[in-house]
Amino acid sequence: MKRLLFMLLATQLSSCQNKEAQNQPTEKKQTKGVQTSQTEKFKYQATGNCPVGYPVEIYRGGFESSDGGYVDLQAGTHTGIAGWGHVGGGMSTLVKTVPNRLHVQWVAYAEECVYEIDTEIDYEKMVQYFKEGYQNSGAFLNYGEYKMETYTAIVVGYAPGGAVFIWLNGSGKQVEIGRYQGKKVIIPQEEIDKLDGFEKLMLQKSECERIMNNPKIVPPDVMEANRDKSIPFDLWDSYRQKYSWRPTFIVQHDGNAFNARLNMFNAEFEGLFGESLSKNEFVKRAIPKQIQISWRDKDLQNYGGSLWFDENEIFAAFAEVYKDRPEGKAEIELRINVTNTFVTAWVIGNGKEVGINLKTKVEVFKSRLKR
């Protein structure tokens, strides 16, 4: 259902931040000299997302492709409760042409305005990622060989200030395609006049207030945390800062880690296992929001653990470690205690070591399986 909200009352509402449109694609992925016809097809779902506390809704628009294809991105109100960059509501998963353009108008409820974006997006990069796929630790072929999988969703994230982010999502990996910038628009009165009664009702300022005060859309703890605070427009761009780092694991008494998943603040995630964990190379990544690990002791008893890092604590640790050497390298060292019941974390590199344990939430469990 289209919801335009409050443009009808534009003179009564505060205007949202009006940034100049500037598209900022992620670092270009090497295409190895292969140029595509821009009509490549893959099976995927197109979905939307937003940060929690800043709900949005698509008024109209979607993905466009060079062969005339179109994928509508209207899917109701996006709440972001599942997490930034998470696969949200969208159309069915079907074989479709990979889009080369995004044209959308969306309502930013927290800002009481409408944004529009009409921009080319990185088609070549998406096609190469779709073709390359990735190895998923949960999928095996015969003889223990890991199965290659590919991405199954294109996720569009709408952040305050008109910032738009696009990711490719799969069950085992999510990668950013690019960051783009929308601009504030006013919907023409003649267009509003053609809307039906229910849609006109949705244009009232009272609807904006209802959305922002609905605990199923904006959780009460988020409402309270955001109360009387200005919108941090640059926050989601700050999440994109990348550093060269890798996780390392210390398991007591000849134990070893055999699987890890890294969930970053910029909504990218990846798995480390088998050869990728054995090599464990330094990679430019965003700062991690969560790390999940699996390990076994010398008796082949399996354990699992998750660490959720406090945003302020881990960002401060990275700032300290990379302060003098922004292009340096560091490790996030996870130390598992002797009884396999707790994990501590340290950012180590460039001659510095900073603990990130005061506010980190840790959960550890013992598996019923041995191997």
Where are the model-predicted features located?
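Low-complexity, Pro/Ser/Thr- and charge-rich linker/hinge segments at domain boundaries
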Residues: I121-I166, I314-K329
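Extracellular ectodomain segments of secreted/surface proteins
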Residues: Q22-P51, P220-W245
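Hydrophilic extracytoplasmic domains
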Residues: S278-R371
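Sec-dependent signal peptide recognition
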Residues: K2-M7
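Activation corresponds to long, low-complexity, non-globular regions
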Residues: T152-F258, L334-R371
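Tryptophan-paired
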Residues: Y59-A108, A257-F309
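C-terminal motif of bacterial Sec signal peptides marking the signal peptidase cleavage site
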Residues: Q12-S15
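Bacterial signal peptide processing site
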Residues: Q17-K19
